[in-house]
Each structure stands twice: as structure tokens, then as C-alpha cells.
């Protein structure tokens, strides 16, 4: 469970962590553990202790030099790219609650539209967070498609989180939906990595007999999504990740090599006033570097941001901050991304 790895302590120094791209998270984590533990050698009587410690300093100095060169090289490359896609990330700062009545649904839609501030004449991809439509399913939202049609134009595309149901199998999913302004589904991604006791109960049938249920609404568990596939909007090749899927490097390593942007939607209200939203955000920085891709993150009561392919935060909204941020995302040529952690296992 890669949440508090030692390597995440470097998230503030993007030059150092550029090495994630060629060697991967777990190899870098092993080197970081060795480095942070290396001062212990000074408690031993050895004539090699200064030499060994100097080797570790030299390794991380070389990481810094490599990272600085890569960042400058990528900056020059990005400056020459003419083709961009306009994206808006919205952070509504909604309280964590379930909506049920038509009145509550309409109020929620109107608020998210206001924060989106759509320009009818400009092609835009809007990204809304997970959890804003908690308590309803996509079919319930479809009843209000007339509001979406009036609020957004044909030049607008929407990405948001909502629960969905497969009526043929009676399975329920935590999904990311991509739609037009009529709420016609263009793409649907069902979350693969579910949160234990939050989205599913292990040994569900047995647990129900003892009255155990999720900490979220209801007894039933969500079903796991079957596959992870990129989708393309306005020439932008997008990899979708829902909530804490962002902490798993494997999900980005085996994605489409031509990924231009990772989209991460999240409900961070669970963390409350803790360090959780900041820890959650740090993982997104690492994924952007490993994947050599831009990353757009929309988090309710978390950190919403645009991160470039070097892990630099271009724009951000803090936890409990409402509004939107916008960026012309360049269609970078993704020549190389970390595909695995073979170096770690070697």
C-alpha cells in the first residue's frame, strides 16, 4: 500500500525526483531509505564512513543535475508546441452529504455550473470532482439534462464522478463519466482500486450477516471496474484515475504510451482538517513525472491543480477553496515514460 513511502518526502524538490521517470518509484524509494539511514555509519568505527556517506551525497547530487537538465530541456520543448487544449478544473468545496430530492439535485447542478463559468463560444473540457453527486446515480442526473443543455454549449465536454448501475447484472460502480452538454455518455470508466470498508466490504456476504457495512452509505459494495483504458477528447489523450487510484504507480505505468494528461477526480472531505489532502496531492506530483504527462486534479475539499510533466504545480486551489483554474494544456509528444520497476527488482 504505497501511501507513506519515504521517497514522498522529496515531493518539494522536483529536480531530485525527475529520476522517477527512468528508474521508477520503488527503486527511488530504496535509494532514499538508504540515504536517510546513512548517517548511522558515523556511530561505527570505520575508516570508510566518510567515503560511504560521500557516495550517497554524490548520488543525490547527480540526481539533481539530471533533473535540472531534464526540466530545462522539457521547458524548451513545451515552448515550441503550438497545439493546446483548453481545460478547466473546478473545486466546488461542497460539504460531504448525500442528495436525494429534486430540489437538492437542482441546487447542486446550479452551483457547479456557476463555479464552472462556461464560455459558450470556447471549446472547453470541464473537470468536476468525485462525490459532488453523492446519493444519486447517473440515470437520476439524466432527468435534469435540460439544465445542462441550457448551461453548456456544444463546444463543451464534461468530466465528473457519479455512481452508475449495470441493470443487467445489478452491479454498482464508482464511475468517471465523460459527456457532452446533453449528458450523452461519450466514455465511462469504472474505478478499479476500491477502498476497503469505504467502497466495498471484504467477504461481503459473511459481513452482512453480522450487520457490518461500509462507512459510506448502505450495506452493498461497489463492483470493481474491469479495465483501464485511455480516452481522447479534442485530441487530448487522457488517462482517468478516481480518488486514491493516484497512489498506485502501476495504473499509470501500463497506460497508453501517448497519454497527454492524467485526470484525477477525488472527494477529499473524508480527511477533514488533517494532513491527508496534502499527502494525497503529493502522490499526483510523482505520477505526472513517472508518466511524463500533464495532470489535472479536481478534488472536493482537497487540492485541485494543474501539474506539468516535470511535477511542477502550475496552478492550484487549496483545500476549502472554491472556484476554478484553467490551462491551455499542450499536446506534448510523450517519448518516454516509466513502464515498470524492473530496476528495483534487479
Locations of regions flagged by a protein language model:
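Enzyme catalytic cores with a strong preference for nitrogen-chemistry domains
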Residues: 1-346
